[in-house]
Amino acid sequence: YLNQRLTMPDDYGRSLLNDIGIEELAHIEMLQTMMMMLMKDATIEEIKAAGLENHYTEHGKDIFPENESGVSFTTDYISSTGDVIANIVEDMAAEQKARKTYDNILRLAKDQEVADPIRFLREREIVHFQRFGEALRLLQEELDSKNYYAFNPNFDCMQNTTR
């Protein structure tokens, strides 16, 4: 979101992407803190029972950004297409996927100290989805009224220099 904000055509979109991008950094901090608290006093047996022996082998009890399969985070997960409509739709999808992940975590969580902050993060993903929906609506209102499919209006303005 912080990368996409620089090419947003309006102040609302730039501010929204900036605010949500910064909030997402705080979400990462919350998740890292929860993981640190859960790992801090874990025994080797508990780490193995949780299926975290590969993580422990590589990182000890340090927090390292990776998915549930142990695949390290990479910027390949960050989408920025150069098309503001495509970016906002992608952002909406990302928020829905995060919300769904939190739904699944809540189904598994037995500890209220885990469930409560996850519930908060889930609620924020819903709000982000709604704000991105508003941004999409505003962008579409600014497009030519004949642009039914809400594609990037700048696409047809680009020169093809290879002809």
Regions found by a protein language model. Give the residues of each.
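Non-heme di-metal
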Residues: Y1-R163
